[in-house]
Amino acid sequence: VKIGLVSLGCAKNLVDSEMVLALFIESGFEVVVDPEHADVIVVNTCGFIDSSKKESIESIIEMAKYKKKLVVIGCLVERYLDELKKAMPEVDLFIPLRQYPKMKELINGLFPKETINIELSPFRRYLSTPWYSAYLRISEGCNNRCSYCAIPIIRGGFVSRPIEDLKKEAALLAAKGIKEVVVISQDTTRYGTDLEVKTNVTELLKMLLSFKEFAYIRLLYLYPDELEDSLIELIAKEPRLTPYFDLPIQHASTHVLKAMRRRGDKEFLRSLILKIRDKVPHAVIRTTLIVGFPGETEADFRELLDFVEDMKFDHLG
């Protein structure tokens, strides 16, 4: 039986796709690059912004033309399950995020006899990244309630993975020859604060550094006001920690930041960026911005423009 998978959205969604591929491959399925030649097509959707939703819907419609077994999973399904069921009867199975623990049983319901014989697990992944690199997802969900963002609605509240589980997964990646680990989360700097035995992302990095196989370790998605000095100092002194700060500020106007329900203000952001530049002179700082936010004035936009020019970010998104 041949499986084809279309994975849309962010790196965190890609990790889910890798777990789904392993579910099929370790049950004897063959992966094909062209879904047209597959017996089962899985579309892992994104439901974050309008363009992502449109891309997901177009992909489902395109895959339905082949009319094999069509399974649709992911954030769009979690957010719009009832609407999708009504609008797309050609889909054989929708699996929202909340039903991922039952994925084995749900998929087996499509076949006359049990076909999938293992459970979905972060310790079983069919890596789709380049041979030397892999993502390590350290948590799920988000507790920030930014006014423009649906992630907490889709993925739920922030839940850290136990550091013992992450150490086990890191060992599996090291055994596969992975040289670069990219640490991902909805809110990486919050890691460990919700665990029974409190820890933090700095301690997590120290654990990853204990694996000599990893030549590079990179962090993504750092919420500005949770970025501790200890983390900056560790990145400054450890050559295997990539001096890359993925620091989404979204805006610089205090008025707009309040409307966005973002913590911190322009002066806090300025002092943080200058601190990073001072402690890590070779740092690369990337940020993301939202312009045209409801209520943003021309003065707000000019304030943001001046701030960006002043801070000299290395990359903007």
Regions found by a protein language model. Name each.
Residues E296, D310-F313:
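Contiguous mid-protein beta-loop-alpha structural module that forms a pocket-lining wall or clamp
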Residues I73, R137, I184, R218-L222, ...:
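A cross-family glycoside hydrolase active-site/sugar-binding cleft signature
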Residues G47-S52, I178-M207, F211, Y223-S230, ...:
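Conserved glycine-rich "GG(E/T)P / GGGxP" loop and the immediately following alpha-helix
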Residues L8, R145, C149-G156, I217-D225, ...:
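Conserved strand-turn element in the central/C-terminal portion of the radical SAM core barrel
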Residues V1-Y191, S230, L241, F245, ...:
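Proteins enriched for Cys/Gly/acidic motifs involved in redox and nucleic-acid/cofactor modification
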Residues A175, T202-E203, M207-Y216, E228-T287:
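Radical SAM/AdoMet-radical enzyme domain recognition
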